[in-house]
């Protein structure tokens, strides 16, 4: 390949991206005591940077991670993490979906929300959470895992 516009370079980039994504996801799945792989998609943020910060705040929240371990689609903990991110957010515009099912919007639970399909989704090993801030066009995707009793067992059983 001698030119930056060589189509083979695009093929290589796509293949390299696929390998890097797979490796990154394997690291998350291999977290100490992890049982669930969680994809958090944030949309409607003020910017891509804001969306990423919000996604990381959700993904790194011990309260969210323990709720995930328990199979609890606790939207209040997700809203708390959004607020802690320090980015622009409006509770009355916020929408939250778990496993493709809208569970909260405009500051409260969705009317007529059926928890059964969400509970089935939360019982699985691959969890999807979508947050729509309804403010702008910023988007981001973050991967995380749950936080289980096994994590405590692993990290509480040795000294350095």
Mark where each language-model region is.
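A structural signal for small-residue-enriched, beta-sheet-centric alpha/beta enzyme cores
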Residues: 1-160
């Amino acid at each position: 390949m001698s030119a930056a516009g060589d189509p083979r370079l695009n093929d290589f980039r796509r293949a390299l991206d696929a390998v890097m994504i797979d490796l990154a996801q394997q690291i998350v799945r291999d977290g100490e005591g992890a049982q669930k792989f969680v994809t958090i998609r944030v949309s409607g943020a003020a910017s891509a940077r804001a969306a990423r910060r919000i996604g990381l705040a959700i993904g790194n929240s011990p309260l969210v991670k323990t709720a995930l371990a328990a199979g609890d689609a606790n939207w209040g903990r997700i809203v708390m993490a959004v607020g802690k991110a320090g980015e622009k957010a409006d509770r009355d515009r916020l929408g939250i979906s778990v496993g493709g099912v809208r569970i909260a919007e405009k500051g409260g639970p969705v009317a007529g929300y059926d928890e059964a399909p969400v509970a089935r989704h939360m019982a699985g090993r691959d969890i999807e959470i979508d947050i729509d801030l309804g403010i702008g066009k910023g988007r981001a995707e973050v991967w995380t895992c749950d936080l289980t009793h096994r994590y405590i067992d692993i990290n509480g059983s040795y000294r350095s």
